[in-house]
Amino acid sequence: MSTLRIPIALQQAVMQCLRHYLQLANQHLGTAYPEPKVNYHQRGTNAGSAYLQSFEIRLNPVLLLENKQPFIDEVVPHELAHLLVYRQFGRVAPHGKEWRWMMEQVLKVPASRTHQFEVASVRSKTFNYQCKCQQHSLTIRRHNKVLRGESEYRCRQCGEKLQFITINPD
């Protein structure tokens, strides 16, 4: 897989946003937390991830390029809040009351757990499975575990083991 090149202006916008919210947090909390490392290696449908111990934020380059400023405005403070909560409170629920407080009271942004960006360009192929009551879509990773006999999946509604039917077209 080739690496996407993020334009310098977009990287600068990410860092400007990050620094703005970090400054807000440091002023509000009376702290001097350092600037986290930022990279653009997040894959799949996740917009970003916060790596707590390494104080690092990973951003999805495809979703960033497709959504630009809305991505920056939503995802950067979301992931920064995870890092700040970990530094301030230790290990707590990922989107718990501490995280919501950090988002709303400290960073002054809405506390949204998930993004609403279009993910068709980053979604992987899925595989159709069936139970007694409905059809399910499994990712390639889960499908391969079934094929290798490493896992089996059951319906949360009826409890029946899922049976493979077809591959979903892209």
Curated annotation (Swiss-Prot):
Q: Does Protein transport count among this protein's keywords?
A: no
Q: Which PROSITE patterns match?
A: ZINC_PROTEASE
- Its predominant location is cytoplasm
* Entry GO CC: cytoplasm
Q: Which keywords does this Swiss-Prot/TrEMBL entry list?
A: Cytoplasm, Metal-binding, Zinc
Q: Which Gene Ontology terms describe the biological processes this protein takes part in?
A: response to stress
NCBIfam families in the record: PRK04860.1 (NF003421)
What protein does this entry describe? Answer: Protein SprT
Q: Which organism is it from?
A: Yersinia pestis
Designated gene of the protein = sprT
